[in-house]
Design a protein with these regions (language model features):
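N-acyltransferase acceptor-side catalytic subdomain
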Residues: 4, 9-12, 16-250
């Protein structure tokens, strides 16, 4: 396992007066990703990241994984120059802290103790997915610096217009960090543990790379699975039937 640094940032309305709006192109907020064409969306840098693909985000909305019932209300920000998409941010109005994998219960409790509303808050993240990827999506031929600033300006305006307590960008990239810092966002550093495959010849070689305590734990857990007669079967492609999907959903 390897510790990987994760970056998230937070912004409160209190300091909004620091900024002057950047004159740029037309901005829109869309309640559904489907309102933006797949072709236009795919021109932006960052949408090659699997969880930022148009089809993936649309599937979350169409399946109701994202929506009012789950507390993730889409309000995706787009910037346009004439009919060309210049930039975008996946934004969600949140009414709970679930599915983010960045825990801010302490902030929510502090707001409540002082008689303030922490929810709704405005969040840019991939729902239910703690994976690092670009959050400020920009067309490769656009002025990246100015488009990123304009995206943040418009997101802050959205935060105020919707009476949200704060604006959050979760699991941002190091590439984006300077623009957040320049605009006064608070940066939060955290860690994830990622397993790396060091080209082990077999499972025994992997076990041999561990400390004695961890090795014994894994051996014991695997023995318990065998004793309970649990079988693991991997299904792919057409072998996955509707009844499998329904069972998994339940």
């Amino acid at each position: 396992r390897k510790k990987n640094p994760e970056l998230s940032c937070w912004y409160s309305p209190a300091d909004f007066h620091r900024f002057t709006k950047i004159k740029f192109v037309q901005s829109k907020f869309e309640p559904k990703i489907g309102a933006i064409s797949t072709k236009q969306w795919s021109t932006l840098k960052g949408t090659e990241f699997p969880f930022s693909e148009h089809n993936y985000l649309n599937a979350l909305e169409e399946s109701s994984c994202v929506g009012e019932e789950s507390g993730w209300l889409p309000c995706h920000l787009t910037l346009w120059e004439k009919k060309q998409l210049q930039g975008a941010v996946c934004l969600y109005e949140k009414y709970n802290g679930y599915g983010e994998y960045i825990f801010d219960w302490g902030w929510a409790n502090a707001y409540e103790k002082h008689g303030l509303n922490y929810y709704p808050k405005l969040v840019s993240a991939i729902p239910f997915t703690p994976a690092t990827g670009l959050k400020l999506l920009v067309h490769p031929e656009a002025d990246t610096r100015n488009v990123r600033k304009k995206l943040l300006e418009e997101a802050l305006l959205c935060m105020r217009s919707r009476n949200c307590s704060s604006l959050h960008f979760l699991f941002i990239t190091a590439e984006e960090l300077p623009v957040f810092e320049s605009m006064g966002f608070l940066i939060r550093h955290s860690f994830q543990f990622h397993w790396k495959n060091n080209f082990y010849q077999d499972f025994d070689e992997f076990l041999g790379s561990l400390k004695r305590k961890r090795r014994k734990e894994i051996i014991r857990e695997r023995r318990q699975i065998q004793q309970q007669m649990i079988n693991v079967e991997v299904l792919e492609g057409e072998a996955i039937l509707v009844e499998h999907i329904n069972y998994m959903y339940e």
